[in-house]
Amino acid sequence: MTELAQQKCQPYQSGSSPITAEEITALQAKIPDWNLLEYEGIPRLQKLYKFANFQGAIAFTNAVGEAAEKEGHHPALLTEWGKVTVSWWTHDVGGLHQNDFIMAARTDDIYRQQNA
């Protein structure tokens, strides 16, 4: 498990601001396989994971969902045959928060554990 994945998600105040561009750059260096994109004017992290079949994709989706429930921070998940697209951003801040990077790192760990 990476150092970033070991961190706990931190509570944030409603109305808080997203993290800065400098913070995004520093945190993204810790999860270089994630894409930083903007959708409907909101920056988010996104990554596509591939699987041999639908069962693997569903198992991964459920594991990410369980991790999200434990932290109270939830992604957008698109599950298809042989692939899952995961997107992290913080709705309440209208952009990215450190929690998104923590959960992206945990998502990578879940994938590695299931595909070891």
Curated annotation (Swiss-Prot):
Q: Which domain of life is it from?
A: Bacteria
The UniProt catalytic activity note for this protein reads:
(4aS,6R)-4a-hydroxy-L-erythro-5,6,7,8-tetrahydrobiopterin = (6R)-L-erythro-6,7-dihydrobiopterin + H2O
Please indicate if the UniProt record lists Lyase as a keyword. yes
UniProtKB keywords: Lyase
According to the UniProt entry, what is the EC number of this protein?
Answer: 4.2.1.96
Key word ATP-binding present in the record? Answer: no
User: What GO molecular function terms would the record report?
Assistant: 4-alpha-hydroxytetrahydrobiopterin dehydratase activity
One GO BP:
tetrahydrobiopterin biosynthetic process
Do you know which InterPro entries this protein is assigned to?
PCD_sf, Pterin-4-alpha-carb_dehyd, Pterin_deHydtase
Q: Which HAMAP family match?
A: Pterin_4_alpha
> What family is this?
Belongs to the pterin-4-alpha-carbinolamine dehydratase family.
Q: What is this protein called?
A: Putative pterin-4-alpha-carbinolamine dehydratase
Origin organism of this chain?
Answer: Microcystis aeruginosa (strain NIES-843 / IAM M-2473)
Lineage of the species this protein comes from = Bacteria, Bacillati, Cyanobacteriota, Cyanophyceae, Oscillatoriophycideae
